[in-house]
């Protein structure tokens, strides 16, 4: 079975073709970073308009890359949520229209299920059960995963997501949008221990997160110590260490609570090298394993949507002809496969 995947939930247009026998056949991606850079963040209307311009040409490019035509596609998967409603509607409308025209089934895919299953695209894929740490610009969640659609929310951020905190703190440090990856690069030049940031909510039981206070702590630290290059790097280092430590502490608790030996990290922030290193070290000490996707599959992409859609379609799930999206969509509401 070959599935075309369409991802348009935010500011990346991702198109891919996945085959259940041979794997990923094509992967096309267009990022809108330059489009939104002047505004310091994603402008929903601009994002939607750009998806309109890019989605069909990228589908054509993906089919060409895979040396396929429309008749070779057995199903279409599109991101139906969560995300920006206008952006989601572009992918959903194109996906449903193509499926109808080609006479194949279409399936709406949950964006975060796509991220959660992205490590399955790798040769060393995780087996169930595992704890998933989903860390992105919009989500920070710990989830018990015992099968496809068998998701139990263990904890989540009560305010800012980890990726959002990275971007906001980067802005305080004078870095351009998107600042998260730039902050991480700056942190590599920082001196460990010059500044010590708190590890929010780690001094109390539970698996929820809170990152908004770190942004405030960073702002106060910047005000008190100036903005010379080394000080900025030292603050970036202290901030990143605090976020990474917090994620590691909570992940360890989730593993202890569930008794699982496998940890999956997914979402844009899972590409962070410091986080990967910290969690790998933690899992080695515990005699467990950590799994993650290659960097290009950590951020939004069509490959994860094509793969998740393939699994859903093979289980017999497909949507009605109507086009609907869900900007807010709890992962736990997904049906078991």
Curated annotation (Swiss-Prot):
GO molecular function annotation: iron ion binding; N(6)-L-threonylcarbamoyladenine synthase activity
CDD domains, per this entry?
A: ASKHA_NBD_TsaD_bac
Pfam families for the chain: TsaD
Cofactors demanded by this protein: Fe(2+)
Name the residues that bind substrate. 134-138, 167, 180, 272
**Binding residue positions for Fe cation:** 111, 115, 300
Q: Which InterPro entries match?
A: ATPase_NBD (IPR043129), Gcp-like_dom (IPR000905), KAE1/TsaD (IPR017861), Peptidase_M22_CS (IPR017860), TsaD (IPR022450)
Give coiled-coil spans as residue ranges: none
| A GO cellular-component term linked to this record | cytoplasm
How does the cofactor attach, per the note? Binds 1 Fe(2+) ion per subunit.
Q: Which PANTHER family match?
A: TRNA N6-ADENOSINE THREONYLCARBAMOYLTRANSFERASE, TRNA N6-ADENOSINE THREONYLCARBAMOYLTRANSFERASE, MITOCHONDRIAL
Question: Which NCBIfam families has this protein been placed in?
Answer: gcp_kae1, T6A_TsaD_YgjD
User: What name appears for this protein in its UniProt entry?
Assistant: tRNA N6-adenosine threonylcarbamoyltransferase
